[in-house]
Amino acid sequence: MSQQKNDDFVDDINQISNVSVSKKESESTLSKVDNNGTHALNDINRRTGRNMPQAIATAAVLVVAIVACLLISIDVFVVLMAAFMVLALWELHVDFATLGLRIPFVTLSLCSLVTIFATYYSKWHAVVMASGITASLFLTVICATLSITIPARTLHAVEKKLQGSSSTKYEHTLFTNTAVSLFVVLYIPLLASCIVLALTNTRYAVAHAMLLVFLPALSDTGGLFAGAWLGKHKLSPRISPKKSVEGLVGSMLFAIIGAYAIIAGFYGSYWLNCWWMPLIMGIASGIVGTFGDLCASMLKRDIGIKDMGHLLKGHGGVLDRVDSILLCGPVLLVLLHLANF
């Protein structure tokens, strides 16, 4: 009887030991899985140059917001686009201020909003758009000049009195601020107005909006992942070291697939009459979108910043997200009219 109790006690000890060993082995396995997962995530972040969990979460929120606006009304989408445009103007205003350059943000914002909504709601869309951009350029020059002239004249007078000589800082400041302000008008309000112009087709406005927004976005996505994992031949290492020829090909492929999917979904069999147009749209979106990213990289390099802003986690600023959309807008607008979509 005593021997049996001892044997039972030994068996219990062995079972406890086995459970302890199994628990340690499972914890070790989980630790290895966690380490492997962390290593894989770090590798993805390193290759893409982004915090991918944040980038994916932000992209999902943006997609839901855009689709929700389109489902409600195209008017709501135009309001959302106008809000993004003002945020992009603010980012440029802040970024240029780091270089000592001043742009008339309030004037630019008001002129841009009036131009966009007047273009969308007016019967003569293109005429109103051209008039609005012309007025914006004129008012921007005046406001940029006035915002610089008064303080610059004061500085000029003080320097002349203290040093006994004139200064060229006044002329240089006036010219550069006016030139930068004009660049901003042509970069954001003009290109955004081209996108609005494509939305005036009331029958296919939603399809146009999806093409104008999602083709450049798909181009960016394809270029990001193709360049990160397949990129070997640098496209322009001095401007953007991560851009590659393989990334450009990936941009075009993703945009082509997106163009066929959107057009087939909205236009049915009609797209078969011009099956080549989605192909051209995808190729154009890939090329122009990549060119837009390179232009934005040049601008950021000159300013001395990595991102235009920090509003969109994982992406940078609003302008970092919409730069390719802005440049693709006029090109896709022309192609939509050529295809009679």
Residue positions per predicted region:
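Short helix-coil transition sites and intra-membrane helix breaks within transmembrane domains
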Residues: 215-218, 288-292
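Re-entrant/interfacial helical elements at transmembrane boundaries that shape
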Residues: 228-229, 298-304, 326, 330-331
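Short, conserved aromatic-histidine micro-motifs
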Residues: 271-276, 315-317, 322, 341
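Membrane-embedded alpha-helical bundles of polytopic integral membrane proteins
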Residues: 2-283
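Transmembrane alpha-helical segments of integral membrane proteins
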Residues: 264, 291-307
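Alpha-helical transmembrane segments that form the membrane-embedded catalytic/substrate-binding core
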Residues: 58, 223-224, 243-255, 289-292, ...
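Interfacial loop-to-transmembrane junctions
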Residues: 302-324
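Juxtamembrane boundary at the C-terminal end of a transmembrane helix
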Residues: 334-341
